[in-house]
Amino acid sequence: AQTVPYGIPLIKADKVQAQGYKGANVKVGIIDTGIAASHTDLKVVGGASFVSGESYNTDGNGHGTHVAGTVAALDNTTGVLGVAPNVSLYAIKVLNSSGSGTYSAIVSGIEWATQNGLDVINMSLGGPSGSTALKQAVDKAYASGIVVVAAAGNSGSSGSQNTIGYPAKYDSVIAVGAVDSNKNRASFSSVGAELEVMAPGVSVYSTYPSNTYTSLNGTSMASPHVAGAAALILSKYPTLSASQVRNRLSSTATNLGDSFYYGKGLINVEAAAQ
């Protein structure tokens, strides 16, 4: 049997899938620790590695494989179901098996996505400060037509200070915070003026290396729900620009409260793909 994680109906991705839109012909890049391409619930069609000695289609950490499943786990009667199971999935490895990496590797990954005509990129990663090269890379990606999605960060509210990380904090990037199954903000979810939308990020069940599955918490888990939602919109309306897709997601989100803590609210991809 196939498990449908709670996040799929919570963002109404099930409704869009039922219309026949599942992300076909949309190229999504997971900029992360790589993807365990041997997993039977994932189909990786390409990628690149910017971590020396590691190939893109392996994942010694697990993070990237989990993120990938939330976007794209196959609709195949087994395992779990992703938000957009028919996307063309690309593994862009910029973080090592410990989950750490350099801004230069991340920049190279973003540039690879831009050069290879990807439609959506997910960055479930971040740091407390940015870099000129990182800003230029995400700005260029967005200008080239890529929907750029990133985890807002797991630094909490820290006495209501702005805790949004980079690259999420940049204008060209959709910063995604985390809610639980009851639509309450996760205590760890970063806050700030740049926070754009919320998605499920508590006890998210997805693919994991060695052909297994596990539940994880984090804005890292919320971000791929939004990347997948963008892919669903693009599979229904292939001619939309990145800014149009972004606007649909934010303008149709369900308000959950103060924008400093919730952005525009929980994404509703059924409404966004009207």
From Swiss-Prot:
Its EC number is 3.4.21.62. GO terms for biological process: proteolysis; sporulation resulting in formation of a cellular spore. InterPro entries: Peptidase_S8/S53_dom, Peptidase_S8/S53_dom_sf, Peptidase_S8_Asp-AS, Peptidase_S8_His-AS, Peptidase_S8_Ser-AS, Peptidase_S8_subtilisin-like, Peptidase_S8_subtilisin-rel, Subtilisin_Carlsberg-like. Gene3D superfamilies: Peptidase S8/S53 domain. One of its GO terms (molecular function) is serine-type endopeptidase activity. It is found in: Secreted. GO terms for cellular component: extracellular region. It is an enzyme of class 3 (hydrolase). Belongs to the peptidase S8 family. This is Subtilisin DY. It comes from Bacillus licheniformis.
